[in-house]
Amino acid sequence: MKKKVLITGGSGYLGEVVVERFLSAGYRCYVLDINPFSEKLASKVVFHNVDIRNKDLVDKACKGVDVIVHCVAQVPLAKNNQLFVSVNYEGTRNILNAAENNKCSHFIYVSSSAIYGVPDTNPVNEKTPARPCEKYGKAKLDGENLALEYASRGLNVSVFRPRTILGNGRLGIFQILFEWVYQGKNIPVFDGGKNIYQFVHSYDLAEAILLCCKKEVFGVFNVGAENYCSMHETLSGLINHAKSKSKIKSMNSSFIIPVMNLFSFLKLSPLGAYHAKLYGKSLYFDVSKIKKTLSWGSKYSNIEMIQESYDWYIQNRDDVLKGSGKSHHK
């Protein structure tokens, strides 16, 4: 019998990729999301149009489900602190309660590399101390701790900590970068862009989650591209690919970071304090644990995935700018 997998946040960018990957592997997929689900996949899943904060409806949606992949997350860019806390913490508690009550065999929590903050040394492995430096990282760490609390009571739990996610349809702050490259504007880096910055493709992350489900392996895993490079090299690869007139311009981080923080505080910028803190810093994972445990390997390099993401943006630019393309939720 095919396993039943429920993906929370399945209407979001990563959630939809996870749904597609599980469907292609023959699983019966259920989606729980407050936002409408993809029309192209609607006939292939059972969709629960439910708010993760509604405990009773969440519990009902999880009846008969074997595996839960929890992708729901409220990002701090929304600037709504009450919504941020209720979705990320209370919502996670609700889905964990439902998993426990319905005796689900496996709970997979999608966390974030933001739990590490700005690490003292690289590469970062699963034993590196978690030191989140902003709200999103703290919320993700709180979610991890909740999940591990339920694990101590007998729930089988896996936690994935992905690096910054890219892939077809990935927008958010990348829309700003892609539009600048399209228009030939200068692209700023801090202190020469020598910092090593790692991404992960949504397909590679979804593949890791699928393998974890298939192999029934539990624990914490860092996920990132195996082939990555400096920020300057990544951006150069994008600019050359786009045949853009953009130039990479180095800026003094000690001057620009306070300005970015001020703009974020005044709500004049879509960027959060975390972006200012980390943009000029190195952060990359040691992925030896996930490679060995799940026999996983990344398909995409940093440069390949940012080029692919840019190509998608250009092909869909008109719809995106009209507001009919994929939103920040994506």
PLM regions with names:
Residues 215-271, 287, 307-310, 317-328:
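Mid/C-terminal beta-alpha module of Rossmann-like enzyme folds, strongest
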Residues 52-89, 98, 115-118:
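NAD(P)H-binding glycine-rich loop region in Rossmannoid oxidoreductase-like domains
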Residues 178-187, 197-232, 236-240:
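Alpha-helical substrate-binding/gating segment
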Residues 158-175:
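Flexible, glycine-rich beta-alpha linker
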Residues 53, 83-94, 134, 138-139, ...:
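Glycine-rich NAD(P)-binding loop of the Rossmann-fold in SDR/ketoreductase-type enzymes
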Residues 5-25:
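N-terminal Rossmann NAD(P)H-binding glycine-rich loop of SDR-like oxidoreductase domains
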Residues 94-135, 150:
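Conserved Rossmann-fold NAD(P)-dependent oxidoreductase catalytic core, especially the SDR/UDP-sugar
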Residues 133-158:
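Active-site Tyr-X1-5-Lys
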